[in-house]
Swiss-Prot record:
It comes from the Bacteria. It comes from Neisseria gonorrhoeae. Residues 1 form the signal peptide. Implicated in a number of adherence functions. OPA proteins are implicated in pathogenesis and are subject to phase variation. This is Opacity protein opA55. Belongs to the opacity porin family. Pfam families: Opacity (PF02462). It is found in: Cell outer membrane. GO terms for cellular component: cell outer membrane.
Length: 234
């Protein structure tokens, strides 16, 4: 917009809705790493969550191409899960043996920050609407932790003589898995959206971006984001 065809530095503020997909690879209970048995359930191996976060950008508009640096912080995800299962092992002569299995899991995941650099091309359909596409490279900081405990208790319930049943604990075992990482990695993404010029200097922007943060040791993280914001050109 304008006689200079939109050239000049600009700032942009967005509010983004992000779909976050986190995949963890923990030791399996069989195979070459069976000496490092993980009690982590599938619930914490494959996390899908959502968050809303702000994003700010500073860039330069060349009249068709735009280059911008952006910064965003994401909401911390945390959850816990407790489950218990009782399995009957034996029942004869008024004596019953059961195995009680308890699982307690606590997990957190936080995309602490993302600092990106993007190159975007605007398609000028008319004086107001400008669809765009682009690519983005970003330096991301991610933290995640898991604390998982599996406890088994074998107990005997005796009803001999018709009296009130008596419960005897026979055996206890406990396995635990603890892990905490703070990782930084460079990832790649794509950008698309539409800009609407409210004034020659002010643009309403609605956009989508996909970003693959890369394999962060035993974790893979990717986000799909839809955003709405305003861009002001100086």
């Amino acid at each position: 917009a304008g006689e200079d065809h939109g050239r000049g530095p600009y700032v942009q503020a967005d509010l983004a809705y992000a779909y976050e997909h986190i995949t963890h690879d923990y030791p399996e209970q069989t195979g070459t790493k069976k000496d490092k048995i993980s009690t982590v359930s599938d619930y914490f191996r494959n996390i899908r969550t959502h968050s809303i976060h702000p994003r700010v950008s500073v860039g330069y508009d060349f009249g068709g191409w735009r280059i911008a640096a952006d910064y965003a912080r994401y909401r911390k995800w945390n959850d816990n899960k407790y489950s218990v299962d009782i399995k009957e092992l034996e029942n004869k002569n008024q004596n019953k043996r059961d195995l009680k299995t308890e699982n307690q899991e606590n997990g957190t995941f936080h995309a602490v920050s993302s600092l990106g650099l993007s190159a975007v091309y605007d398609f000028k359909l008319n004086d107001k609407f400008k669809p765009y596409i682009g690519a983005r490279v970003a330096y991301g900081h991610v933290r995640h932790s898991i604390d998982s405990t599996k406890k088994t208790t074998k107990f005997l319930t005796s009803s001999y003589g018709g009296l009130n049943p008596t419960v005897y604990t026979e055996e206890n075992t406990q396995n635990a898995h603890h892990q905490s990482n703070s990782i930084r990695r460079v990832g790649l993404g794509v950008i698309a959206g539409v800009g609407f010029d409210i004034t020659p200097k002010l643009t309403l922007d609605t956009g989508y971006r996909y970003h693959y943060w890369g394999r962060l040791e035993n974790t893979r993280f990717k986000t799909h984001e839809a955003s709405l914001g305003v861009r002001y050109r100086f």
